[in-house]
Amino acid sequence: MPFKNLPTGSAAPLASLVEARPGQVSSRSLTRIGDPLAATLLAFAEGESVSGETYAGDTLYYLVEGKAEVNAVQMTAGDVLKVPAGTPHAVRPVPAAKILQLSLI
């Protein structure tokens, strides 16, 4: 399972790898489709969110930058939260955030 879209010659801040765009949630996949682990870096613009997400495997959210709520759990930069497999959940930035999402497939 090789990673993709990551720097190899020099280090870079994780938050610099994806930029929020007004009116959307931007994403950068760090693994390939079909891998047993889906790693995605998400950038939420102010006012954007996702709801009704459910994954077959456990999902880990690591807040890279900003503040957010995952199922009403408050998170700040550096926080991590596990959402168990099959649990419907929503992600809402307060007001904008960058999040690393790791999901077991």
Located regions from the model:
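A short, N-terminal "cap"/entry segment at the start of jelly-roll beta-barrel domains
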Residues: 1-40, 71
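Conserved short histidine dyad/triad with adjacent acidic residue
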Residues: 24-27, 35-55, 74-77
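Conserved hydrophobic/aromatic beta-strand scaffold that supports enzyme active sites
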Residues: 39-41, 60, 80-82, 101
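A short, compositionally biased micro-patch
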Residues: 45, 55, 63, 84, ...
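Glycine- and acidic-residue-biased ligand/ion/polar-headgroup-sensing regions
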Residues: 56-70
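Ligand-binding loop in jelly-roll beta-barrel domains
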Residues: 74-76, 85-105
